[in-house]
Regions:
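Iron-sulfur cluster-binding electron-transfer modules in prokaryotic oxidoreductases
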Residues: 1-161
Length: 161
């Protein structure tokens, strides 16, 4: 399991079960245990677990026109379900299609919570204490990350033909 030194107490989260993970693979409890391990409080949407609601991407609804002549997008309906839960800090997902669909829908319906991968909540819980006690600036996504040290790169290039 994960090691959290400063729990995300008071953080309000909802989780969207992705279609294939929940309906076909019946994996619904593991993501909830991860949320629980962070110390965040989980608020369930009415349709969750194996009864989850599709984001719309898999059925071609991702290509609906912007005019909404066909009605509200499934992803917007789902974000409204999350909004109906009251104040939320985060809506977490574990599917790349869900991330794209719900991020866009959250902007469209002006949701006041962040849509992101579940792993971002775990990262926050694991690094929060470090960020609170560190004087260093926190990492932001626009900063380059070095995955291989320069010495390792130069050693490798010296031995690579």
């Amino acid at each position: 399991m994960i090691s959290v030194t400063t729990p995300l107490t008071g953080t309000r989260v909802t989780y969207h079960d992705p279609c294939y993970l929940a309906r076909y693979n019946r994996i619904t409890e593991a993501p909830r245990r991860l949320i629980e391990a962070t110390g965040a409080q989980l608020f369930e949407m009415p349709r969750h677990g194996a009864d989850t609601f599709c984001c719309g991407a898999g059925g071609g609804r991702i290509w609906m026109s912007e005019s909404h002549a066909e009605g509200e997008r499934p992803s917007e309906q789902r974000i409204r379900e999350a909004q109906a839960l009251g104040r939320l800090d985060y809506c977490r997902v574990t599917c790349p299609k869900d991330l794209a669909m719900y991020s866009d829908a959250a902007k469209t319906v002006r949701a006041e919570f962040e849509v992101a991968e579940l792993t971002a909540l775990i990262e926050l819980a694991m690094t929060q204490a470090e960020l609170l006690t560190s004087e260093a600036e926190p990492f932001t996504s626009d900063q380059p990350r070095t995955l291989v040290s320069s010495s390792a790169t130069s050693n490798r290039s010296a031995t690579t033909p």
